[in-house]
Amino acid sequence: MKLKSGSMVKIRNKINDIEPYVPGRSIKEIADAYGLKEDEIIKLGSNENPLGPSPAAVEAMERELESVHRYPESALTDLREAIADYAGVGMDQVIVGGDGADEIIDVLGRTFLEPGESFVVPMPSYMYYEYTLQAHDARAVHARWDVNENRLDLESVLDAVDESTRLVFLCTPNNPTGGLIDKKDIRAVLESTDTLVVVDEAYTEFAGVDNTDLLPDHENLFILRTFSKVMGLAGMRIGYGLGDPQIIEYMHRVKPVFSLTRLSHAAALATIRDRDYIKKSTEYSIKSREYLYSGLKKFPELRVFRSYANYILIDVRGTGRTAAELSEELLRKGIIVRDCTSFTGLDEYWIRVSVGTLEEDRRFLEVLGELVQ
């Protein structure tokens, strides 16, 4: 590749094939683009906690501010112990990442994938698996998530695994559809292969999903979780994984040493110890989800999917608009939702709406009604 300057700087061939990951626009970007005030904008596009962080986390970060000139902890022993207690596993089964669960995905790639090997993802699902692992010269193999039934097509996963497969990703609740994967199906995948099966439980609290009971009998199980959702720390970028101690030890060999900042460490530790906050956040988000679901079901123009996460997938083709068109109309009214056109396995007629405060939910339903009815 030749840069604009004419320099023959060598770029890896694989990087030329990767389309940049495009996250949702920020509140400031939307405000500037549409002439809106930032405090008027309702963000329902990124599956965040509408209640904000735990007060204990805020206090912990404030106390830690005077120490940010010091390097952070590397072993993270106290945080790993707290996560182990929360998840019901041993501390040697825990790894913590400093760019949310996305760092853990990258570490999985660096630990298990050789160039040319493959990983399996049922689509549609979280796009970052593929985005991250392609950079390791790995090959994505798509299995099928049955969108109409909102369930995993188990046979497609079993058929997709071959001798080149090193990782299988199963997201439950699935993002963006909100559907669950039955534990018997997870067990079937685990017992059909020696490949590492990564079960993404980023939204575990909203669904009561917990597959940690499968860990003792399946050393090829790895569970992926995050502090970005019910824990209310999306801006602090903290994720963690649970797995066999030997797998965790190998992953620690390639994980960045100081990736978790002092502030993130303090916030995560305070939050996971604040069980009242976690319970309150879980209950509120579920209440908001059910309020949104019942409100959306009243629109005959929409096909609304039952969700077990903190978001709802909606087929909007009955409105006569594409997802991009409806999302744009909502943006002009100060409401951000996720246009799901970029998700492999979905066409141009799907949006995903995150739970907000009940007042934000009411405003969204009101504006949506004005636009489509």
UniProtKB/Swiss-Prot annotation:
<dbReference type="InterPro" id="IPR015421">
    <property type="entry name" value="PyrdxlP-dep_Trfase_major"/>
</dbReference>
<feature type="modified residue" description="N6-(pyridoxal phosphate)lysine">
    <location>
        <position position="229"/>
    </location>
</feature>
<dbReference type="InterPro" id="IPR015424">
    <property type="entry name" value="PyrdxlP-dep_Trfase"/>
</dbReference>
<keyword id="KW-0032">Aminotransferase</keyword>
<protein>
    <recommendedName>
        <fullName>Histidinol-phosphate aminotransferase</fullName>
        <ecNumber>2.6.1.9</ecNumber>
    </recommendedName>
</protein>
<dbReference type="GO" id="GO:0004400">
    <property type="term" value="F:histidinol-phosphate transaminase activity"/>
</dbReference>
<dbReference type="InterPro" id="IPR004839">
    <property type="entry name" value="Aminotransferase_I/II_large"/>
</dbReference>
<dbReference type="InterPro" id="IPR005861">
    <property type="entry name" value="HisP_aminotrans"/>
</dbReference>
<comment type="similarity">
    <text>Belongs to the class-II pyridoxal-phosphate-dependent aminotransferase family. Histidinol-phosphate aminotransferase subfamily.</text>
</comment>
<dbReference type="Pfam" id="PF00155">
    <property type="entry name" value="Aminotran_1_2"/>
</dbReference>
<dbReference type="GO" id="GO:0030170">
    <property type="term" value="F:pyridoxal phosphate binding"/>
</dbReference>
<keyword id="KW-0028">Amino-acid biosynthesis</keyword>
<keyword id="KW-0368">Histidine biosynthesis</keyword>
<keyword id="KW-0663">Pyridoxal phosphate</keyword>
<dbReference type="GO" id="GO:0000105">
    <property type="term" value="P:L-histidine biosynthetic process"/>
</dbReference>
<comment type="pathway">
    <text>Amino-acid biosynthesis; L-histidine biosynthesis; L-histidine from 5-phospho-alpha-D-ribose 1-diphosphate: step 7/9.</text>
</comment>
<dbReference type="InterPro" id="IPR015422">
    <property type="entry name" value="PyrdxlP-dep_Trfase_small"/>
</dbReference>
<keyword id="KW-0808">Transferase</keyword>
